[in-house]
Amino acid sequence: DRCPCPCPCPCPCPVIRPPPPKELTVGINGFGRVVAVNDPFIDPEYMVYMFKYDSTHGRRVVVTAPSPDAPMFVMGVNEKGKLTGMAFRVVDLLRYMFSR
């Protein structure tokens, strides 16, 4: 594998690969199970903490309609109904499920 660095010389820098996805079981109001999260550098315990206690990511979750590049898009909503940010950025469940 080549280094993602744009320099023309052979780079000694390592190619960084995310760890293989682990199956997470997180039940949220009976919604379902989280199978894949596109941020491999967040610890699963920290994700659970963010869902429970961080109001920045919202107390409710809105699942929007699919688009060509993201079959499922999950965003956090705060208690006033405003979209406050993406819950763990984009959680792309369908792409993972249909790629299998």
Curated annotation (Swiss-Prot):
Reactions accelerated catalytically: D-glyceraldehyde 3-phosphate + phosphate + NAD(+) = (2R)-3-phospho-glyceroyl phosphate + NADH + H(+)
Pathway(s) this gene product operates in, as recorded in its UniProt entry: Carbohydrate degradation; glycolysis; pyruvate from D-glyceraldehyde 3-phosphate: step 1/5
A single Gene Ontology CC term: cytosol
Binding, D-glyceraldehyde 3-phosphate: 89
Keyword Cytoplasm among UniProt keywords: yes
GO terms classed as biological process: glycolytic process
EC number(s) reported in the record: 1.2.1.12
GO molecular function: glyceraldehyde-3-phosphate dehydrogenase (NAD+) (phosphorylating) activity; NAD binding
Compartment annotation: Cytoplasm
SMART domains in alphabetical order: Gp_dh_N
Alphabetized SUPFAM superfamilies for the sequence: NAD(P)-binding Rossmann-fold domains
Binding site for NAD(+): 39, 64
The UniProt record lists the keyword Membrane: no
Keywords for the protein's UniProt record, in alphabetical order: Cytoplasm, Glycolysis, NAD, Oxidoreductase
Task performed by this protein: May play an important role in regulating the switch between different pathways for energy production during spermiogenesis and in the spermatozoon. Required for sperm motility and male fertility.
Similarity annotation: Belongs to the glyceraldehyde-3-phosphate dehydrogenase family.
Subunit structure: Homotetramer.
Name of this chain's protein: Glyceraldehyde-3-phosphate dehydrogenase, testis-specific
Organism: Mesocricetus auratus
